[in-house]
Amino acid sequence: MVAPEEFAAWLTGHEHTDKKLGWVYRYHSRSDSHSIALCQFVLKDLLDASPILRKQALANRLIYRINCRHTFPNGKQKTLDLAVGTPKVVSESASFAETIMTGEIDRVLMSCEAKTVMTEHGKSQPRVFDELGSSHEIVHQGDREAIAAGITVVNIASTFVSPLRQKNSDRLHVSQHKQPHAAERMIQHLRGLPIRDSIEGTGFDAYATIVVDCDNQGPVSLWTEAPAPQRGDRDHYDRFISQIVAAFAARFD
């Protein structure tokens, strides 16, 4: 499962240039490029881990869409960061990972909500928790069998250059973080998200937190030691992938 490592490497190489001030950042909260990249890495891991998903994708029985605006059978609408489902219309563009096409989805079989907490960890706790919680609620209210997954990237860097706090081109404003305490509190807070063990239950079908060290100026690294989730934890990335794969096989094979 390589998405966490790939995402950290992607952030290291990514450049978001402030057109007004000239500063260059790895991450900008008002851009969705990081969410798109993370969802693509997750999708690649799912295709590699699930022979069933891969087989159905190669047969065009499944397609995917990123930033998918979908209306569920009950009339509720939601923009899904990543959606995989049955096709209504298959795009003529090239396939992703030489496996799965994009297009217009008829029925969503799997969705993933992607969140990022790079700074202001304490202030972000209620908002991120509520947004994640509402995502699985909307998906399951629309289709009890659909797999609802969530993933959050939490920053453990002790300093962070926030694009929204920069006022001039002469001097960077650098925010200070009390680490690893800030990251640990966010990780523990998100462990309160429910994870269901059957389609009658309430909660995500799979959830993961990954931790990165990103000051938003230099290289970004994946943080794998505590307080990051460890193997066996219910919010570890490998378990997240295995839970999605198992649920897909049980419900949609």
Residue ranges and their predicted role:
Residues F7, G103-S111:
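Short coil-to-beta-strand
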Residues K115-R127:
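Surface-exposed cleft-lining segments at the edges of enzyme active sites
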Residues Q125-G142, L193:
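Short, charged, amphipathic alpha-helix that recurs within catalytic cores of restriction-modification
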Residues R107-V108, R144-A148:
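Short glycine-/polar-rich loops that comprise or flank the Walker A/P-loop
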Residues L82, V108-T116, L132:
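Conserved catalytic cores of phosphodiester-cleaving nucleases, focusing on short active-site segments
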Residues L58-I105:
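Active-site metal-binding core of divalent-cation-utilizing nuclease and nuclease-like domains
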Residues M1-N60, Y64-H70, E145, I156-D253:
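C-terminal tail/extension regions appended to the core domain(s) of diverse proteins
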Residues E113, I147-V154:
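Short, conserved beta-strand edge motifs with alternating hydrophobic and charged residues
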